[in-house]
Design a protein with these regions (language model features):
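Conserved donor-binding/catalytic core segment of Leloir-type glycosyltransferases
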Residues: 29-34, 195-203
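Acidic/histidine-rich catalytic neighborhood
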Residues: 192
């Protein structure tokens, strides 16, 4: 089960375990970015909001983990994403208790997303994309794609083509934002009345 791209020392994190203490005092935003390329799409989120929130980053590859730790150090908490199995996901969520979850690009974990919906945890799909090849596969399972994506409070596509493909598979409203590696239009701000109500705002 442990692949070469994974960390053989920290592999227990893939089963929901952690050796860390949960930081106190600030609410936690969980950003999932599977690879280095996807992680770079979350750069501006980390740089703009680490002062006001605890930022938990999950990745699935050691290369992405090394990039996150090297470039951001104490600004973030890094963990490997748990495998998409209910028991391990619940263990992870019970410990970290995120107020907002941000999924970057295309690495959607169906079981995890359903667990977030059950817990009423706000989830956003940013820099969303779906390749023509994946789109052709999902067309045969569009009802399941609708079931997964109805969890998302908002979906922002990285291109007009991605927007059209995703719109045809989901009942959600999909907005075009552009590639987050090239833009910083998106702002995430706490509601003025309560820090637990997080608004998504487009500049």
């Amino acid at each position: 089960m442990i692949q070469k791209k994974e960390d053989t020392i920290r592999y227990k994190e893939r089963f929901g375990f952690t050796n860390l203490q949960k930081p106190l005092g600030k609410e936690l935003i969980w950003i999932h970015a599977s690879s280095v390329g996807e992680f770079k799409s979350s750069d501006f989120l980390i740089n703009n909001f680490f002062n006001n929130y605890n930022i938990l980053i999950t990745t699935t590859t050691k290369t992405a983990a090394d990039y996150a730790i090297t470039n951001y150090g104490d600004k973030i908490i890094h963990q490997y994403a748990p495998y998409d199995v209910t028991f391990w996901i619940n263990k992870f969520l019970d410990f970290w208790q995120p107020k907002l979850v941000i999924w970057i690009e295309s690495d959607l974990w169906p079981n995890t997303i359903v667990r977030l919906r059950e817990r009423k945890i706000t989830s956003v799909f940013l820099n969303a994309r779906i390749s023509p090849k994946s789109f052709n596969k999902w067309k045969y399972f569009s009802s399941y794609y609708k079931f997964i994506t109805k969890t998302f409070f908002a979906i922002y596509a990285q291109s007009q083509n991605d927007l059209k493909r995703i719109e045809s598979l989901t009942n959600n409203e999909v907005k075009y934002l552009g590639n987050l590696k090239l833009t910083n239009k998106l702002r995430i701000l706490p509601n003025s009345s309560t820090s637990t109500n997080i608004n998504i705002m487009i500049a």
